[in-house]
Amino acid sequence: MYFKRYLQLAKPGIIFGNLITLTGGFLLATHREIGFEYLPLFVYVMIGVALMIAAGCVFNNIYDQDIDSSMTRTQNRPLVTGDISVIQATIYGTILLILSCLVLYYLVNLLTLWIIIIGFIVYVGIYTVSKRLTIHATVLGGISGAIPPVAGYTAVVNILDYNALALFLILFFWQIPHSYAIAMLYIDDYKKVKLPMLPIVKGIAYTKKIMLFYLALFVVSCALPAVLGSADLFSFIVCMLVALFWMYKSIQSYRTDTDRVFAKTVFKFSIIVITAICLTMG
């Protein structure tokens, strides 16, 4: 019972999604090889990053417990129900944070540790706070969400270069339509707690146009690894095909479907697209 609640506090779904994108960065650096040579490092960086993301999610839960209690989709979270106290959650998050730093420092490299720490600070210290204050919080949160693939890449090469920037841009531009789709689907919940989400402040019609704008930027960014010479023809073809398909389905839905169906379409294909891209990167 308690193990399940502590696991829930760490948001395993978010961890899993971020580890998929981390894998994309790792595969780009190793040219789609995770053999005996790279397997230990792959395991270490996965564990280290997973622990840091889990820590970030725990502290996010602590800060958000007041609004979580008022939203339908979050009202059963452990801190809201009282299954876990704030003190217990703080200790838990701190332990996860320390373990992550130890794993990344001793078993991966210092650069990757600093990159992940930056992601943690942006997520907990900037995004979590700013989402109550500004419509731009989603964009700020996109910075932290674009960190894992960069960490996967630097775990192997131990440098920041244009390939790392390309990975960052791909994930950053992907996250905006993905996140705004979620905001549209749960707009009633966000209205309850008066969060200044873009669909609430600027309206659904404006939000849909912004989503398509970032989707177009995402399509362009998907070509960057191949342009830089780090991704092969197979990876380039897969990336461009799935990105263009997502763009096509989203535009099609924009023209013919209701707002909710449009949001579901963008969200559903965002998951398929980023998974396909990350698992064929290299």
UniProtKB/Swiss-Prot annotation:
A single Gene Ontology CC term: plasma membrane
Reactions the enzyme catalyzes: heme b + (2E,6E)-farnesyl diphosphate + H2O = Fe(II)-heme o + diphosphate
Group of enzyme by EC: transferase
Protein name: Protoheme IX farnesyltransferase
EC number: 2.5.1.141
GO molecular function: protoheme IX farnesyltransferase activity
Gene Ontology BP annotations: heme O biosynthetic process
TM ranges: 9-29, 39-59, 79-99, 102-122, 139-159, 165-185, 210-230, 231-251, 261-281
PANTHER family: PROTOHEME IX FARNESYLTRANSFERASE, MITOCHONDRIAL
Membrane topology listed for this record: Multi-pass membrane protein
Gene: cyoE
Source organism (scientific name): Francisella tularensis subsp. holarctica (strain LVS)
CDD domains, per the entry: PT_UbiA_Cox10
Compartments (UniProt record): Cell inner membrane
Family: Belongs to the UbiA prenyltransferase family. Protoheme IX farnesyltransferase subfamily.
Keywords carried by this UniProt record: Cell inner membrane, Cell membrane, Heme biosynthesis, Membrane, Transferase, Transmembrane, Transmembrane helix
NCBIfam families from the UniProt entry: cyoE_ctaB (TIGR01473), PRK04375.1-1 (NF003348)
Pathway: Porphyrin-containing compound metabolism; heme O biosynthesis; heme O from protoheme: step 1/1
Role of this protein: Converts heme B (protoheme IX) to heme O by substitution of the vinyl group on carbon 2 of heme B porphyrin ring with a hydroxyethyl farnesyl side group.
Domain of life the protein comes from: Bacteria
Further facts: Carbon 2 of the heme B porphyrin ring is defined according to the Fischer nomenclature.
Chief location of this protein within or outside the cell: membrane
